[in-house]
């Protein structure tokens, strides 16, 4: 190699060595990016957040255009349990700081977007997160290196040409590109991102809105009171969130146009594929809707002589002229900054606007590239809340736990309990856990049984579609069977065409629990960890493969699954049947009697009484058990027997009966 070659090699070496390196690079300081930064910061990891604007949450400085968020801020629940309250707090991020709850930033049920901007700024400052502001990453590529964690580094270039090197890339840029239309006359269409939000600009106008989503209805709601009429047009039928149980569908706060449409107050809703349409502007500046094929067959250059559908069909629904046409079709992910070497592609069908990722939120094309937040919604699009703060705060935590195990050898957090605590552990989680509640059928709790079912290990909020890879992803073993705790709606209850208010829609009887419609806990039992093939060929509409046994806890109007007879007893009997054991608790006297009369003791007596632990019954404890419907009141039975002339001796009231139905609780 000559002198010039040495100089080039030296220059390249210096360029590589001068790259600032971070183990974790996060793109975007929105809610998802800050949430991941908070977890990385608390774990003491080497990370940097890159934000193109001068402050966090720049999306909320512009959107929603009419400034009202549709994520609820329920400040009062009647409960003091912080985890339970997060079920109904759709705006807070997860942290250990009680001051960083959104209820301290707004009293409104539907807050103003500026409150979210203020909240995110405080979140970053109070936690001391490492954010590099005014840094717009314009290009991302790969640099293969066998020494790197994933076999390559991610090379980021900003608007100034500065290059950064990362071992793991976490993309939390959201959906930043407005979805456009492309038909003749589309140049006349105004976009949601730029149209006026002042109702005075629409007084006495005829307005056509393209789209049937929340942004379209938000726009219509703002101008309903001043326009002549508002028509809405989209390819698909309107999807109402209370019917689909999907928070991303049209919410009641914005559906005023549906009211005026159905009550025939001039406003209207139409369905048609936009790609077949065209817009024509007449000499008065009005816009007419026509069909593309009519333009193709017309040679006239005069706007007023172009054929319209009403020429052949005089009751064509859209024969009226419009003053304005507004596009409200949502957004798509910005793929433009990613080099082809990353193989980051879009999803399929309705999820085309999202990157194609695994259920672990990792790109299918590049190991070590994870998609977070709204952009990760392809995993649960139109199913759960993964595209929104109250959903992705938990999926981001799941990704962090996966990374902690993969790169730092820290297993998925778990707690080990004796088997006697199995029923109570499940009941506690289904009644208070927020991640299970919001990310239903996406994140599930996993219970790993120990040998001989003497104990169990409890893992919270694992991505259930990755169940076959649980051991590899978590560092935990599932050799002796497992339970999966999921929250589900009834399989035939949700859909845009469903009547969810029909009479007798709820299930109240225990024996009909499997027919429950509303969100309720479902427990799956597997003797062995399902395989990839099991997951792939699971029954239609099932979130998991067919289990060894399954149990539905009957739906509850109060979402309070603590009823001793209606909820706890059926669950405990199900668990006992799966494990072939007795999960009841006993007083010391009963355990003593069992040791004299049984060859096999219940686990409670084995793990408590035989280790010199346990509780002796007293009059007050027995009375509490009777009042709680946990024990039979034998005193009352004895008095009744005496009145009937039956002089048989009733069991001692301070000792649990071996054959009492009440004792089964």
Curated annotation (Swiss-Prot):
Cellular localisation: Endoplasmic reticulum lumen
PTMs per UniProt: N-glycosylated.
Main location class: endoplasmic reticulum
Motif Prevents secretion from ER per UniProt: ranges: 662-665
Source taxon at top rank: Eukaryota
One Gene Ontology term of the molecular function aspect: flavin adenine dinucleotide binding
Record keywords, A-Z: Endoplasmic reticulum, FAD, Flavoprotein, Glycoprotein, Oxidoreductase, Signal
Pfam families reported for this sequence: Pyr_redox_3 (PF13738)
Family membership: Belongs to the FOXRED2 family.
Function: Probable flavoprotein which may function in endoplasmic reticulum associated degradation (ERAD). May bind non-native proteins in the endoplasmic reticulum and target them to the ubiquitination machinery for subsequent degradation.
Protein name (record): FAD-dependent oxidoreductase domain-containing protein 2
Native species: Mus musculus
Top-level taxonomy: Eukaryota, Metazoa, Chordata, Craniata, Vertebrata
């Amino acid at each position: 190699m000559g002198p010039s070659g040495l100089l080039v090699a030296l220059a390249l070496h210096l360029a590589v060595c001068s790259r600032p390196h971070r183990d974790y690079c996060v793109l975007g300081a929105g809610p998802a990016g800050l949430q991941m930064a908070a977890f990385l910061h608390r774990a003491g990891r080497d990370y940097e957040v890159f934000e193109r604007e001068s402050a966090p949450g720049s999306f909320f400085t512009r959107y929603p255009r009419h400034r009202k968020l549709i994520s609820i801020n329920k400040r009062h629940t009647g409960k003091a349990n912080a985890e339970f309250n997060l079920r109904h707090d759709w705006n807070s991020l997860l942290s250990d700081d009680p001051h960083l709850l959104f209820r301290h930033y707004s009293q409104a049920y539907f807050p103003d977007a500026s409150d979210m901007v203020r909240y995110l700024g405080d979140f970053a400052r109070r936690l001391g997160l490492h954010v590099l502001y005014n840094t717009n990453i314009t290009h991302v590529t790969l640099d293969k290196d066998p020494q790197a964690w994933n076999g390559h580094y991610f090379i980021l270039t900003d608007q100034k040409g500065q290059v950064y090197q990362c071992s793991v890339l976490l993309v939390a840029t959201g959906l930043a590109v407005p979805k456009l239309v492309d038909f003749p006359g589309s140049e006349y269409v105004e976009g949601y991102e730029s149209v006026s939000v002042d109702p005075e600009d629409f007084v006495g106008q005829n307005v056509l809105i393209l789209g049937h989503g929340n942004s379209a209805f938000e726009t219509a709601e703002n101008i309903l009171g001043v326009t002549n009429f508002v028509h809405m047009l989209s390819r698909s039928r309107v999807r109402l969130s209370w019917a689909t149980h999907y928070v991303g569908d049209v919410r009641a706060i914005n559906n005023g146009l549906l009211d005026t449409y159905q009550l025939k107050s001039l406003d209207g809703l139409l369905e048609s594929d936009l790609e077949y349409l065209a817009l024509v502007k007449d000499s008065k500046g009005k816009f007419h809707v026509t069909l593309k094929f009519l333009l193709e067959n017309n040679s006239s250059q005069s706007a007023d002589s172009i054929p319209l559908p009403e020429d052949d069909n005089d009751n064509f629904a859209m024969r009226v002229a419009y003053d304005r046409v507004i596009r409200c079709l949502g957004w798509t992910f910005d793929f433009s900054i990613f080099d082809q070497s990353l193989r980051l592609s879009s999803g399929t069908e309705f999820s085309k606007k999202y990157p194609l990722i695994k259920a672990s939120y990792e790109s299918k094309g590049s190991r070590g590239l994870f998609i977070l937040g709204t952009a990760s919604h392809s995993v649960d699009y139109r199913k759960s809340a993964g595209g929104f703060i109250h959903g992705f705060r938990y999926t981001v935590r799941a990704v962090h736990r996966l990374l902690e195990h993969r790169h730092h050898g820290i297993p998925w957090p778990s707690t080990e309990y004796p088997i006697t605590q199995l029923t109570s552990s499940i009941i506690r989680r289904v009644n208070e856990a927020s991640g299970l509640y919001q990310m239903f059928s996406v994140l599930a709790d996993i219970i790993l049984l120990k040998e001989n079912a003497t104990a169990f290990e409890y893992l919270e909020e694992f991505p259930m579609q990755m169940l076959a890879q649980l051991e590899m992803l978590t560092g935990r073993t599932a050799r002796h069977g497992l339970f999966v705790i999921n929250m589900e709606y009834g399989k035939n209850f949700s859909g845009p065409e469903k009547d969810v208010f029909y009479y007798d829609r709820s299930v109240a009887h225990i024996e009909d629990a499997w027919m429950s419609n509303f969100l309720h806990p479902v427990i799956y039992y597997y003797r062995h960890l399902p395989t990839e093939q099991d997951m792939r060929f699971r029954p239609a509409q099932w979130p998991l493969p067919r289990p060894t046994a399954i149990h539905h806890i009957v739906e509850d109007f109060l979402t309070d699954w603590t009823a001793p007879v209606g909820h706890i007893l059926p669950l405990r009997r199900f668990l006992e049947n799966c494990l072939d054991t007795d999960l009841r608790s006993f007083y010391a006297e009963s355990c003593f009697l069992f040791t004299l009369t049984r060859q096999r003791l219940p686990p409670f007596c084995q793990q408590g009484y035989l280790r010199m632990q346990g509780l002796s019954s007293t009059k007050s404890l027995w009375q509490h058990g009777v009042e709680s419907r946990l024990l039979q009141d034998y005193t009352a039975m004895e008095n009744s027997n005496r009145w009937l002339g039956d002089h048989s001796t009733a069991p001692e009231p301070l000792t649990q009966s071996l054959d009492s139905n009440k004792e089964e609780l």
